[in-house]
Amino acid sequence: MVKEFNTQTELSVRLEALWAVLSKDFITVVPKVLPHIVKDVQLIEGDGGVGTILIFNFLPEVSPSYQREEITEFDESSHEIGLQVIEGGYLSQGLSYYKTTFKLSEIEEDKTLVNVKISYDHDSDIEEKVTPTKTSQSTLMYLRRLERYLSNGSA
């Protein structure tokens, strides 16, 4: 049975800039904001919308070595994107289903609320490092790094 874990964070960046790096430019941005984890991101199939398949290749010291994800939700008007792990990554660590959905909302001109929903399932006991509490910390760290990246004028 799929379970959900929800969290949120406020970032001091414009909604449009954050949406661009989360939805369109992440193939080039992810390795820049997570250089200690991600070697590169490859577009395998699709045009960036629903059905697009990506491979996140991790550095040699990171295990597992890759994660294949599919964009399962993409709504430009509501600024919502969902990425489901379909191979490797968390699925190699005991989870049978893992999806992260980001929904952006403008708080004010230079402040954006990011709602994060993690949907997950597992067939057996899972390692502590892949519990939604732990994986959500990684997701929030990624969002903070995106905030820093955008604040430094890198986008």
Swiss-Prot record:
Q: Name one GO cellular component term.
A: nucleus
- Binding, trans-zeatin 1: 22, 69, 139-142
Q: Which GO terms describe its biological process?
A: abscisic acid-activated signaling pathway; defense response
Keyword set, alphabetical order: Allergen
* Endoplasmic reticulum listed as a keyword: no
Q: Which GO terms describe its molecular function?
A: abscisic acid binding; cytokinin binding; gibberellin binding; protein phosphatase inhibitor activity; signaling receptor activity
InterPro entries, per this entry?
A: Bet_v_I/MLP (IPR000916), Bet_v_I_allergen (IPR024949), Plant_def-hormone_signal (IPR050279), START-like_dom_sf (IPR023393)
Q: Would I find Magnesium among this entry's keywords? A: no
In which residues is gibberellin A3 bound?
67, 139
**Which segment of the chain is annotated as a signal peptide?**
none
Q: Where does trans-zeatin 2 bind?
A: 67
Question: TM segments?
Answer: none
The UniProt family comment states: Belongs to the BetVI family.
Q: Which PANTHER family match?
A: OS08G0374000 PROTEIN-RELATED, PHYTOHORMONE-BINDING PROTEIN
What exactly does this protein do?
Binds the cytokinin trans-zeatin in vitro. Binds gibberellin A3 (GA3) in vitro.
**Quaternary organization:** Monomer.
This chain belongs to the protein called: Phytohormone-binding protein CSBP
